[in-house]
């Protein structure tokens, strides 16, 4: 198969996985900053997140990560040397609106991403930017229960409008949410929900929150298209490949 000459070969990063600097230049904590690594109880924390904001773990990978916040110029240069033509990135919501409810955005955060996207462009790398990659502002989790509350839709719209307008000439390709369906599988990871998987109201809470995210995603697309009709905006779905253990019919039935 012959690919088009403008096919976007690239790599991917996410703010909570690479930036670090979790409380610098006005940024406040987000949901990912309370998750420990796999060796210190990450899976249990995600499935039973009721006390995650108060629990103290030995190590939080997102708080330092690979220090991309301070070293992005070096990292972009190295990525360019590898020959990539596109780089998936995400914006940390709390770098722009630290609590999610400020009337005015944080200029330090806006400037950082402007410089980051400009650096990508300088090396001929197309930024593909996600608005929300598993990082709900802590303040919105505590006050509203994160995406369980419809009021997050308007706050997300404000955030989306701010970054769409600021980077209208730097970014063409956008994603509203990373793995938007993950909120139904691991609610804390996907949407900052503190609901336990054993809660009898689990399905009601989770699917209501998923609905709110879907509405917010649609609203963001509408906003973005008004700001720049040339924007290409979508979202990302989580998926996995599974195979029967063997060709035994019982395994095949179990798989389906």
PLM features per residue range, with description:
Residues 67, 104-106, 149:
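Poly-acidic low-complexity segments
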Residues 1-56, 99-101, 110-255:
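Active-site region of glycoside hydrolase catalytic domains
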Residues 91-105:
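Glycine-rich, proline-tolerant flexible connector loops at the mouths of alpha/beta enzymes
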Residues 66-78, 153-163:
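Short, acidic/polar
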Residues 61-69, 206-210:
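Short acidic-aromatic active-site loops that bind/stabilize oxyanions
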Residues 71-92:
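Catalytic domains of carbohydrate-active enzymes, especially glycoside hydrolases
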